A protein has these predicted regions:
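Transmembrane-helix motifs of polytopic, lipid-linked glycan transferases
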Residues: 69-90, 128, 132, 346-353
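Extracytoplasmic catalytic/substrate-binding loops of multi-pass membrane glycan-assembly enzymes
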Residues: 11-24, 35, 40-55, 61-65, ...
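Transmembrane-helix signature of polytopic, membrane-embedded enzymes
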Residues: 79-105, 123-124, 150, 362-367
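Short helix- or helix-capping micro-motifs
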Residues: 1, 99-107, 111, 131, ...
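Membrane-proximal stem/loop segments at transmembrane-domain junctions that anchor or position
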Residues: 231-317
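Membrane-interface transmembrane helices that cradle and orient dolichyl/undecaprenyl
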Residues: 129-164, 190-194, 359, 407-412
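Specific aromatic-rich, kink-prone transmembrane helix
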Residues: 81-85, 102, 121-140, 164, ...
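Short acidic/glycine- and proline-prone juxtamembrane loop motifs at membrane-interface regions
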Residues: 114-121
């Protein structure tokens, strides 16, 4: 289905705006064996997806059709992962299969894995992290209930799964740095009352170890290469500027697709001018510093916010609406807007019903924390509908499918 969607738009024609940054990073990896200092004028993209393109295409990332094929393959992993997590949560094969099918055909998942964009890889990594952490806690609970040799095997399996969960979250963060905000949730097993304190601590510690071991090599590489602390990339400044500068309210007020390109060009020119006013121009030591470029753009955006308190309040309201609204953008046309609105309103209702009736209350609280943290982080930085999808839509499906079944059956 994902390949069919990619073919419909043209296998050799990328549609996503940042595709060239990803491909150029992968190209430089293949050509020199090193990652470029910048993949755009302002920053270097998080390395996860470019590394994946370089490896999965066997060194041919300039082949856009092949890029789309390997992205579709990565995105397709979301469906079985959702089914696996659903089975662990609800113990029903029918619900798990239905959830997997829903994940395979959900338009947002299909769309984002049919082009050259990082969501195709980010979504399965994020799901893998959540599913592995869930299974690690379940194995620890089995250990609590077991005795003898079987208990020891459960402990070992639980620790291995926890390390893998932490590593998967680190790889997700190396693909989309916003996932760093979810790192504290690796400590969630500490609150699992099914387990004794010692197994809880082991699972939580193992997940943190896996996260650190997977993230540290890249962070150390950045420290050695730039002489600066950059956990993943220096893209925060440019993204924060987009979401908080004087341009942000204008962007969220756009109603016509034809206005987007001129607005982006004008905003790019403004960013360049603001950096130049501070002496940050290509060829200077100041510009070569990722942190200086990033912090300069953050400070510029904060100055805009301080100069316009009323606009800041309006911007926050617009961000909340753009995050929660049940359709992506009016640019897609009213038939899509109306159908997406009907679908997502129904999915919201079904997911709420599923959460209220779910027996595993700890898992519900964990998912609510993911919803809240992901929303808060993006409200502070930049809100786009495609940023919400990998964080919210899997949870909406996981609880929406059993919730819809309960709504269909009616009250017990």
């Amino acid at each position: 289905m994902r390949l069919a969607a990619a073919s419909a738009a043209g296998l050799a024609t990328p549609r996503f705006g940042d595709w060239d940054a990803f491909v150029s990073g992968a190209r430089e990896l293949v050509r020199t064996g090193t990652y470029p200092d910048r993949t755009t004028y302002f920053f270097f993209e998080a390395p996860g997806y470019p590394f994946y393109l370089a490896a999965a295409t066997l060194g041919h990332p300039d082949d856009i059709a092949l890029d789309k094929a390997v992205s579709a393959a990565a995105g397709a992993a979301a469906a079985p992962l959702l089914a696996w997590i659903s089975l662990a949560l609800f113990g029903s094969r029918r619900v798990a299969i239905a959830t997997g099918v829903a994940g395979a055909i959900l338009p947002s998942f299909v769309l984002f894995s049919s082009d050259v964009q990082s969501e195709a890889l980010f979504l399965p990594l994020l799901l893998a992290a959540g599913g592995l952490l869930l299974r690690a806690s379940d194995r620890a609970a089995e250990r609590t209930a077991a005795k003898g040799r079987s208990a020891g095997l459960a402990v070992g399996a639980g620790a291995f799964l926890a390390v893998a969960a932490g590593a998967a979250l680190a790889f997700a963060a190396l693909t989309r740095p916003s996932a760093l905000a979810l790192a504290p949730l690796l400590l969630a097993p500490l609150a699992d009352r099914r387990n004794a304190p010692a197994p809880r601590r082991r699972v939580a510690a193992a997940s943190v170890i896996g996260f650190v071991l997977a993230l540290a090599p890249w962070t150390i590489r950045n420290a050695l290469h730039f002489g600066e602390l950059l956990p993943v990339s220096d893209g925060l400044g440019a993204t924060f500027f987009d979401g908080n500068s004087a341009w942000a309210n204008r962007i969220y007020a756009l109603k016509d697709r034809s206005e987007v390109a001129p607005m982006n060009a004008a905003m790019h020119a403004d960013r360049v001018a603001r950096l130049a006013a501070l002496g940050l121009v290509p060829g200077t030591d100041a510009f070569r510093s990722p942190s200086r470029r990033s912090w300069a753009l953050i400070h510029a955006a904060l100055e805009d916010r301080r100069a316009d308190p009323a606009g800041t309040r309006l911007l926050l309201l617009r961000k909340v609406w753009h995050w929660l609204r049940p359709y992506p953008t009016p640019f897609w046309g009213w038939p899509i807007v109306v159908s997406a609105t009907v679908f997502y309103l129904a999915l919201y209702a079904a997911a709420a019903r599923g959460m209220m009736s779910a027996e595993r209350r700890g898992a519900v609280r964990f998912c609510l924390a993911v919803l809240a943290i992901s929303m808060a982080v993006h409200l502070a930085i930049l809100v786009l509908w495609r940023y919400r999808v990998p964080y919210w839509d899997p949870i909406l499906l996981l609880y929406g499918v059993p919730g819809a079944a309960r709504l269909h059956r009616g009250p017990a």
